[in-house]
């Protein structure tokens, strides 16, 4: 019984810590982890079919992809 109560308390603490990070800050951290470069609007190969700024990616050739608005 003590183990269940302890697990519930730990879960509540972890959830409250996750909620403490604002959504916008979390998105910025995520984009930074992907190595996004929104200034030149190139698609990051590891980011999948999306660009960092939310634009769609058009593949011009194997080595060059650009983001379209």
From Swiss-Prot:
Alphabetical keyword list: Amidation, Disulfide bond, Knottin, Neurotoxin, Secreted, Signal, Toxin
Domain comment (free text): The presence of a 'disulfide through disulfide knot' structurally defines this protein as a knottin.
List of residues that carry Leucine amide: 68
Disulphide bridges, residue numbers: 36-52, 43-57, 51-67
GO cellular component annotations of the record: extracellular region
Signal peptide as annotated in the record: 1-20
Signal as UniProt keyword: yes
Entry's transmembrane regions: none
A Pfam family matched in the record: Toxin_7
Native species: Agelena orientalis (Funnel-web spider)
Highest taxon in the source lineage: Eukaryota
GO MF entries: toxin activity
Keyword Protease carried by entry: no
Residue positions assigned to the propeptide: 21-34
Tissues in which the UniProt entry reports expression: Expressed by the venom gland.
SUPFAM superfamilies in the cross-refs: omega toxin-like (SSF57059)
Function: Insect active toxin causing rapid but reversible paralysis in crickets. No activity shown in mammals. Does not show effect on mammalian voltage-gated calcium channels.
Similarity comment text for this entry: Belongs to the neurotoxin 01 (U2-agtx) family.
Protein name, as recorded: U2-agatoxin-Ao1y
Subcellular localization, as worded in the UniProt entry: Secreted
């Amino acid at each position: 019984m003590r183990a269940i109560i302890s697990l519930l308390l730990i879960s509540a603490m972890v959830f409250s810590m996750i909620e403490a990070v604002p959504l916008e800050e979390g998105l910025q951290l995520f984009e930074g982890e992907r190595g996004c470069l929104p200034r030149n609007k190139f698609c990051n190969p590891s980011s999948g079919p999306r660009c960092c700024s939310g634009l769609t990616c058009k593949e011009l050739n194997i080595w060059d992809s650009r983001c379209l608005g």
